[in-house]
Amino acid sequence: MRRIAVMGAAGRMGKTLIEAVQQTSGAGLTAAIDRPDSSLVGADAGELAALGRIGVLLSDDLAKVADEFDVLIDFTHPSVTLKNLAFCRKHGKAMIIGTTGFTVEEKQLLAEAGKDIPIVFAANFSVGVNLSLKLLDMAARVLGDDVDIEIIEAHHRHKVDAPSGTALRMGEVVANALGRDLQEVAVYGREGQTGARDRKTIGFATVRAGDVVGDHTVLFAAEGERLEITHKASSRMTFAKGAVRAALWLDGREPGLYDMQDVLELR
């Protein structure tokens, strides 16, 4: 059995991850961690996820459960994830990282840690989203510079980063396929007298409202026709199941920084 720890276990995504682990053959939740000031520390992780008691108590310190897991799943905040990354690197623990909002420099730290431990880092662990990335690469290469490209994403009102990590990853895939640098061609929102659109740019539009789990559309607009590639998530479980799948896939892997394209053999 693959022994899995969940960081941020008392949060919305954390509870979904607990449920996904418990539903997956070959995986077992052996540790659950949340922030030290959480009033839920000491509670049964199964009860937090409405599964009933499973005998795993919520801890407030990763070090306290260091001997109880093989791989840590972390969907939290960059500052928290980087601290956990240093711990896992020191103690030889594999990691699944679904945290978004990293800077370029922080992503380099993930790559450095990948020299010592196996890591799967992805902006989105959904199988559908990762298939969409493959389709986006194909579409961008075929349509080339003959279309305007816009990325529209929507999430729930509690999401703290914008654009979403998934939207940015979609932009990176499209830009790479076209031989462009996303940092140079991205346009984040428009207002006022913007002038005519530069076809070389890739636009981003963000919606934050209600309880939207995650919608992403990439629009390729030409004269007389347009192509839209859309993915809509209706439950966080799709991300959680993908993360657990990645955790099982990492078993026995050499150190390295992998992503879901590797897990799904889409390369």
From Swiss-Prot:
Name the residues annotated as catalytic in the UniProt entry: H155 (proton donor/acceptor), K159 (proton donor)
Where, in this chain's numbering, is NAD(+) bound?
A: G8, A9, A10, G11, R12, M13, D34, G98, T99, T100, A122, A123, N124, F125
Q: Does the keyword Plastid apply?
A: no
Pfam families recorded: DapB_C, DapB_N
The family database entries (PROSITE patterns) matched by this protein are listed as:
DAPB (PS01298)
Positions with a binding annotation for (S)-2,3,4,5-tetrahydrodipicolinate: H156, G165, T166
Query: Where does the record place a coiled coil?
Result: none
Q: What does this protein do?
A: Catalyzes the conversion of 4-hydroxy-tetrahydrodipicolinate (HTPA) to tetrahydrodipicolinate.
Q: What is this protein called?
A: 4-hydroxy-tetrahydrodipicolinate reductase
